[in-house]
Amino acid sequence: MAVQTKGYQAGVKDYRLTYYTPEYTPKDTDLLACFRMTPQPGVPPEEAGAAVAAESSTGTWTTVWTDLLTDLDRYKGRCYEVEPVPGEDNQYFCFVAYPLDLFEEGSVTNILTSIVGNVFGFKALRALRLEDIRFPIALVKTFQGPPHGIQVERDRLNKYGRPLLGCTIKPKLGLSAKNYGRAVYECLRGGLDFTKDDENINSQPFMRWRDRFLFVQEAIEKAQAETGEVKGHYLNVTAATCEEMLKRAEFAKEIGTPIIMHDFLTGGFTANTTLAHYCRDNGLLLHIHRAMHAVIDRQRIHGIHFRVLAKCLRLSGGDHLHSGTVVGKLEGEKDITLGFVDLMREDHIEEDRSRGVFFTQDWASMPGVMPVASGGIHVWHMPALVEIFGDDSCLQFGGGTLGHPWGNAPGATANRVALEACIQARNEGRDLMREGGDVIREACKWSPELAVACELWKEIKFEFEAIDTL
C-alpha cells in the first residue's frame, strides 16, 4: 500500500517497478554480476532478480523519503536480464549491472560487502549463488593486484620452461620446529623448488612461529648451497591481528626468506590486501591458501563460485593461489577449473559459458596469479597435471612426497624425475594424455626412487563425481 504526499509516495511497491530494466545496455564502467537464483514459490523471476539488484545496491523493503535527496537512477543496481538455467527447474541466471560509483577504489572488502553482504538472506529467495563478476577496467586500475606476478617470480627463481614443484610438510600439526626444518631440508635437497606450511600452522605451543622461521630458513640455505638452485618455503604469517601478521612478515624478510603465505579467506580481504602491499614494497613473494573456500563455494545453488573468489584474490593480491587439481582428492571439474585458472593468470579472457566464464574480463596488464594444484596427487598424475596446467603452475605434492617408503628426499627426487621426464616428452612432441604412463615407466628404469613411488601408488585413485558441474 502506498500513501501519496506532496512530491513523495510512501509505502511498499514491487522491486521490479524500479530495479528490473531489461531495456538497459550495460556500460563499460559498470561492474556486472551473474547470480544463480532460486525464487520462493510464487515469486516471479523478474521480481526476484530486481530484489537482488535492489538489496545489493540502493534499495530497502519500503520506499523512503530520503530517496528524494539523491539520484537513484544514477546509483541503483539494475537487473537487466533474467534467463532460465538450462536443465534446471525454478533456477534462473540473473544479470545485474552496478554503477562504478557504488564501490570504494581498491577495496575488495567493500565490493563484496555490497554485492553479497546482505542479499543472501533475503526471504524471497530459496537459494542464491554468485556465479561470476566482470570488473570494469576503470575499477581494476585502482588495485595493485599481485605483489609480483608469474614472470617476476620466474626471474627471481631463475627457473623456466616447466611447472614449479612443491610439498606441504606433514604431519601438518605436532612437529617441533627443528624436526619441521629437517623435513623441509630433505624435500628441498631432493629436488623440490618449494615446501610449504599447512594452512593451520600459525604459532601453536608445540612450534612457535619464530622458531619455525629460523629452522626453516637454515634448511633453505643449506639446500640451496648443496643444489645450486634457488629454494623457498611458504612461511605462513597468518595471525590473530594485522599487526602481528606484519610483524611476522617483517621477520621473514629480515632472515632472507623469498616467500611467505597467507590464508586469505579466514584472514580476510582487508588483511590480505594489506599484506600484498607489504610484499610488493619489501620484495617478498606471496603464496595464498584458500582454507574455508568449500564452505562458501561447494554448493551448486547457494554461495559464491570459486571463480569469483579467485578474481577477488587477484585484485586483492597474491602470487600463488590454490586452484584444485582435477585429478586429485579435492573437488574440481576440468573445464570449470581451467576456466578460473585462466582468469587467474591470463590478461584477457573471453566469455565462454562452457567453462563457466559468464563475462569477458580484461585485467589491464595486471600481473597474473600462479595456480597451485594440490591435494591427493602423486607421480602417476604428473603427465595429466603437466598437460592440464601447463608451465605456469605449481604442482604441490604433500603425501605424494613424504609418503615415499625411502623418505622425504627420495620422494622429492621421484617427483622431480617424473616432472623432468614429462617435460622432455612433451617438448619432443609426445602426447602426455595418451602416452603419459609409458613416459613415467620409461623414467623408472633409470630412477629407483621413481620406480618405488610408482609401485606404491599404482592403485590409488580418487574417482567421485564432481558436485559443481555445468
Swiss-Prot record:
Keyword Lyase: yes
Pfam families cross-referenced by the UniProt entry: RuBisCO_large, RuBisCO_large_N
Main location: other
Name of protein: Ribulose bisphosphate carboxylase large chain
Residue ranges crossing the lipid bilayer per the database entry: none
Site (Transition state stabilizer): K329
SUPFAM superfamilies: RuBisCo, C-terminal domain, RuBisCO, large subunit, small (N-terminal) domain
Family of this protein: Belongs to the RuBisCO large chain family. Type I subfamily.
GO cellular component, one term: carboxysome
Remaining remarks: The basic functional RuBisCO is composed of a large chain homodimer in a 'head-to-tail' conformation. In form I RuBisCO this homodimer is arranged in a barrel-like tetramer with the small subunits forming a tetrameric 'cap' on each end of the 'barrel'.
EC category: lyase
GO biological process: photorespiration; reductive pentose-phosphate cycle
The protein's Enzyme Commission number: 4.1.1.39
Cofactor remark from the record: Binds 1 Mg(2+) ion per subunit.
Location of this chain's protein in the cell: Carboxysome
Organism of this sequence: Prochlorothrix hollandica
Residues that coordinate or bind Mg(2+): K196, D198, E199
Cofactor needs: Mg(2+)
Quaternary data: Heterohexadecamer of 8 large chains and 8 small chains; disulfide-linked. The disulfide link is formed within the large subunit homodimers.
